[in-house]
Amino acid sequence: MHLSEITHPNQLHGLSVRQLQQIARQIRDKHLQTVAVNGGHLGPGLGVVELTLGLYQTLDLDRDKVIWDVGHQAYPHKLLTGRYDRFHTLRQKDGVAGYLKLCENKFDHFGAGHASTSISAALGMALARDLKGEKFKAVAVIGDGALTGGMALEAINHAGHMPKTNLLVVLNDNDMSISRNVGAIPRYLNKMRLSQPVQFIKDNLEEQFKQIPFVGESLSPELGRIKEGMKRLAVPKVGAVFEELGFTYIGPVDGHNLEELITTFQQAHQIQGPVLVHVATVKGKGYEIAELDQVGYHAQSPFNVATGKAIPSNKPKPPAYAKVFSHTLVKLAEQNPKIVGITAAMATGTGLDKLQAKLPNQYVDVGIAEQHAITLAAGLATQGMRPVAAIYSTFLQRAYDQIIHDVCIQNLPVFFCLDRAGIVGSDGPTHQGMYDIAYLRCIPNIVIMAPKDEAELQRMVVTGVNHTSGPIAMRYPRGNGHGVPLMEEGWEPLEIGKSEILRTGDDVLIVAYGTMVYPGMQAAEILSEHGIEATVINARFVKPLDTELILPLAKKIGRVITLEEGCIMGGFGSAIAEALMDADILVPVKRFGVPDVLVDHAEPNESKTELGLTSHQIAERVLQAFFKQQVSAVV
């Protein structure tokens, strides 16, 4: 059977190990070739091919439910559940999503994009099953560092207290998250992986006994007791934590041995109560380049399969915002030993790996634990340190209570650096950084800013590090800057709450924030071609707003446009509208940003076009909103 013939995972039933191995090779090839063209997550999926095949051969997936944590390790799952023919559209607009979506496929039982949610979701399904008297298996596959997340441990704590609730947790242990795993739990799991020689000896006892002359066959009845004794000897050193928490622990199992995996899963399904199967895998398995560089090949832009090297663009690009942030922070940290960079398992993505390499004592990676990261930062701040928490906008949502309770209420000087703010592209709605303006600006004490370009980002990094009177946040986008000149040192901090006028005109006021400043300026030039002159303000700060500058201009000009790359509801435009209303300035305001919709996976420019946020679309919308009759008369 060829992979392309599989439209339902139950077609794996009855296939031999040799046939499954052939399917495994085809999955890896399709996975590799697709990601090489489209970009996407590479290492996680390559590492779970045999795990997926072995698990699915032992389940009835018309009935049983498998919940994949995070979702980036589920590419093999997608290839086995009727999406082979469309897999070439992976992460493209209207194509197969890079993560799991309930609406995409009936075998995607729970959406995912953030880590550590699978055990909670699977346990909820198991409880619903028991309450309704239904019969199906609930399985959570968790790994790639997600077990370091507090939510996963909370779910394990709860599940272990329910000995009559059947739940299978499959721990995909590849000793990695996105970067190398950190913390006591991964260290404990690593010790368990090192116990595999004991497991190997135990599994091969029968063959060894048979080779004993004269008495080998007669010893076979004793084999079960000897194996159980070895288990008792090994479990206190290996699976003791999970056993003490109420789980039956099985493992470690070789995650690339199909025969062993199938046997293990069959045994696990027979056990009453919560079971944890510990599967040891290799991230990037089957593609040697990815195996040797598991951090670099966690996810990839399009690359050459033969060399593993990224396909170069046609022209040089300016440095990425994350790179400029990293370079600036390292320079400042070299001068100020109180600066401490904090990441939640995203050292490479945020650029803090450069700080780790240069100043390891001023760097902390807490693992996938955003809540802990923020309260850790608060603790550092109480002792006069300058904590810089560099976290993707979408992941900071997970620490909202800590932002309010531990930082803002106590008015502690924590510097939040929100990478990937705004439209992020092909990762889809779970990763869009749409909500940070709205969820942060309602909190007292916090200052919030966003740079128009990479040079202004440098000044904002200095501003954030120097701001000691309370918390401050900076949001900045994924991708490359505008190519403006950068300084190596001597950056001047900005005055808190002060904006700048970039262009003057009497017909319309455009107040732009962050990444929308450049499109706002370009839209103003297009409007000028129609005889309409705009004043353009780079707001810089959404909190506090520069009301001294913005309000008089709004009153004088009488027409206001706000631009932001974030949700309109509660966002930057709402802040402007509220300020005008509070000052009794009754002028028309049009807010351009992301409406009350989820932005699906697509290239960022495709999403911006769909949302009407390109410079030409902004100009057209301004004309339609305020100058329709005037333009019609000219035409």
Curated annotation (Swiss-Prot):
Alphabetic keyword roster: Isoprene biosynthesis, Magnesium, Metal-binding, Thiamine biosynthesis, Thiamine pyrophosphate, Transferase
GO molecular function, one term: thiamine pyrophosphate binding
InterPro entries: Dxylulose-5-P_synthase (IPR005477), THDP-binding (IPR029061), Transketo_C/PFOR_II (IPR009014), Transketolase-like_Pyr-bd (IPR005475), Transketolase_BS (IPR020826), Transketolase_C (IPR033248), Transketolase_CS (IPR049557)
Binding-site residues for Mg(2+), renumbered to this chain: 144, 174
List of residues binding thiamine diphosphate: 72, 113-115, 145-146, 174, 287, 370
One Pfam family recorded for the sequence: Transketolase_C
Keyword Nucleotide-binding: no
Known pathway: Metabolic intermediate biosynthesis; 1-deoxy-D-xylulose 5-phosphate biosynthesis; 1-deoxy-D-xylulose 5-phosphate from D-glyceraldehyde 3-phosphate and pyruvate: step 1/1
Needed co-factor(s): Mg(2+); thiamine diphosphate
GO CC terms of this entry: cytosol
BP GO annotations: 1-deoxy-D-xylulose 5-phosphate biosynthetic process; isopentenyl diphosphate biosynthetic process, methylerythritol 4-phosphate pathway; terpenoid biosynthetic process; thiamine biosynthetic process
EC number(s) on file: 2.2.1.7
Subunit structure: Homodimer.
Family note: Belongs to the transketolase family. DXPS subfamily.
NCBIfam families: dxs, PRK05444.2-2
Protein name stated in the entry: 1-deoxy-D-xylulose-5-phosphate synthase
Native source organism of the sequence: Nostoc punctiforme (strain ATCC 29133 / PCC 73102)
